Amino acid sequence: MVEPTAFIDEKIAEIADDVGDANAVIALSGGVDSSTAAALAYEAIGDQLTPVYVDTGLMRKGETDQIRDTFDYMDSLRIIDARDRFLDALSGITDPEEKRHAIGEQFIREFETVARDVDADYLVQGTIYPDRIESEGTIKSHHNVGGLPEVVDFEGIVEPMRDLYKDEVREVARELDLESIIAERMPFPGPGLAIRVLGEVTDEKLAVAREANHVVEEELEEYEPWQALAAVLGKATGVKGDNRVHGWVVSVRSVESRDGMTARAQELDWETLQRIQSRITGENENVARVVYDVTHKPPATIEYE
């Protein structure tokens, strides 16, 4: 396990040495990984750092407003509305790897635009060890590892937490006195809801996934899962009132894990599962059914794509 104080001192010195007198931008998502990386980088280089939050249109319900409120103390924070550009980049793409690469490409282009504006030579990222293992082992690319384009307009990419597991990141976050809403936050994938809708990403699928994920996180908070999510799988026949409908199938997944490398599906009580399905089908008229995923990792991954 990492010793937080020693790690923080080491990484602050390392970031300062890597960046020198140059400027840097950091990809800020509001999750514990990027927030911890931002705190480390800010301690190291101060106003040379510009945090950038990109509203991709693929985020959780209320995410952008929460980012604005949580990080309003950072005067240099940039919030970029790139929703249309990301949907355009994903148009017609159904393959999971291609989706991740398209998202990685667009992320980098957004950061390059800001970097040119603030004359930044470095990109700081919150990449952690499981991201690298899955990308290097070709299990699946992460938008900030294997999903990066081959040509990147930065002098260097700085990844201070590339050797940490998620639980170690949380220890460092606590040592840095990050708010509990950040330090203890449930993992959310970099590509966002794009990998929680199977097949092509559309506004309709994203709307269903966003509302369903909100329900799942609310209802399962007391169970303290390592990660809980809802994914839009496809369509199936259902009945609403007296009418036959062809609506979306939503899969609910909740797992326990230490580091994300392996995970066990949580055993949830029937009443909770019924409450979740009732809310999802009741609040989304185009959802026909809800299922619960009982598969561990392995053989499954935690996310669907």
UniProtKB/Swiss-Prot annotation:
Keyword match Metal-binding: no
The keyword Hydrolase is annotated on this UniProt entry: no
Protein name in UniProt: GMP synthase [glutamine-hydrolyzing] subunit B
GO MF annotation list: ATP binding; GMP synthase activity
UniProt function note: Catalyzes the synthesis of GMP from XMP.
Record-linked PROSITE patterns: GMPS_ATP_PPASE (PS51553)
EC number(s) recorded for this UniProt protein: 6.3.5.2
CDD domains: GMP_synthase_C
Keywords: ATP-binding, GMP biosynthesis, Ligase, Nucleotide-binding, Purine biosynthesis
Superkingdom: Archaea
InterPro entries given in the database record: GMP_synth_C, GMP_synthase_B, GMPS_ATP_PPase_dom, NAD/GMP_synthase, Rossmann-like_a/b/a_fold
